[in-house]
Amino acid sequence: MPDADSARATAREAIALLTGAAGFTEHRPPPRPLPPDGPLGWAGYDAARERASARTGEEESVVYGTGVVGDRACVLISFEFGFLGGSLGRNTGDRLAAAYELALARRLPLVALVATGGSRMQEGMVALTQLQRVAAASTRLRAAGLPQIAVVRDPTTGGGWATVGAGADVVLALPGAQVGFAGSRVRPPHADPYAYSAEGQFAAGQVDAVVPADELAATVTQWLRALGPHEDLPAAPVPRALPTAGAEPTAGVGTGSAAGTEAASGTGSAAGAGTEAASGTGSAAGAGTEAASGTGSAAGGGAVAPLPGTGREAVARARDPRRPRAEAYLADYFAVRLPLHGDRSGATDPGLLCGLGLRADGQPVAYVAQCGTPTRPAGYRAAARTIRLADRLGVPVLTLVDTPGAANDAEAERAGAGAAIADTFAAIAAARVPVTTLVIGEGGSGGALALAAPENTHVTVDSYFSVIAPELAAAILKRPPSETGATADQLRLRPQDLVELGFALSIVG
């Protein structure tokens, strides 16, 4: 069921849900009178508009203007579902286009509170073509580096979902809302209703978070802080190393190379990204916040673990289940995390975490983090989506590499593994913002390399990176299992090897 507090909130009630006492300044475009009964001369259309206006107090199905959410100014759009089902007609298009232009002129983010049944049939093709106007206006905002957030209410269907809703950079949904291109009266009679719900769209990777009404203002505020707009943000600092559970650290061990080392005192990385750390607790689940505090060096602020003596040892340490994983690194690095969920093509990969986060000092950083599992095509598509969003908004990117490789099962091939990996390589190659990479575990061939930043990759002492897993290399060379260790040494996959080969800038102890 829809969220009781906001399922059928009016347009202005929905705005007040975000702005509270901060207020809202309404804007209106120059009026354009419609011909009698609209462009189609639809009998009774004028009377229906008059009844809708008397019932809602609105002149159209959209209200827009400027407001403050938390501490962030923005342009707000809110649909009035009580006015002809929140449908889009010519005058609605005028208001939507004007709202996007207002955001562009004032360089403000745009937040849309959507509740609509789609295009207004009483205006026919004149109504339908308003979707093209919205798409064009949204594209201009994207080109200007201005973020768009959609909050989809109940119901959000048809062209409104396919433009203002699903076309936003971040899509939040209220619990239980009906969300889908096909409305309830036009979908197949036996269609699964879950697929058309906020929760179903979240499961399919089309919605970033389902947020209760009483958490919406705080969540949108955090997103506005993270998304900006921003200018000239520094590179993401290299995360500090985290100790392996139950392991005893050994005092300062060098990398054995002049190519770039970081001492336990934390003097900074060879990439010039700086050294900064945070510690805290929290969960990656949902759109909530996670506390973090403190500072330290990229080397962990103290003693460091010894480097692996052999290739076999490096692989064993990277595969050690006690080794800290992406979740621990992200919780330590960020004060607040805001997940981006799904690939927008109908799938998700729980083994890859994406989103934007705020550090303890307020700096926003986008993150893409592998969790130690084979990365699926949906994961690579979500990664590319995150990197391109960050690049467009001027937000630096942090990637955490940890995978035995890309998923290689038949389903992954059918889902376009090759194209998805290629797209991730391209997203990083084209990024204008700085990308920082830390290899925290397994670096399994191209499936890992797709997320690595050329010339700004760092490694932990518990990591390795290889063109192929040593077991597979030995098998290809028809060597017995007893020679796997020697093969690992030949591959030169240890952290210190990666620095000496010029792949990694430094070892984070």
Predicted regions: what is each one?
Residues 247-299, 310:
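Long, intrinsically disordered low-complexity tandem-repeat segments
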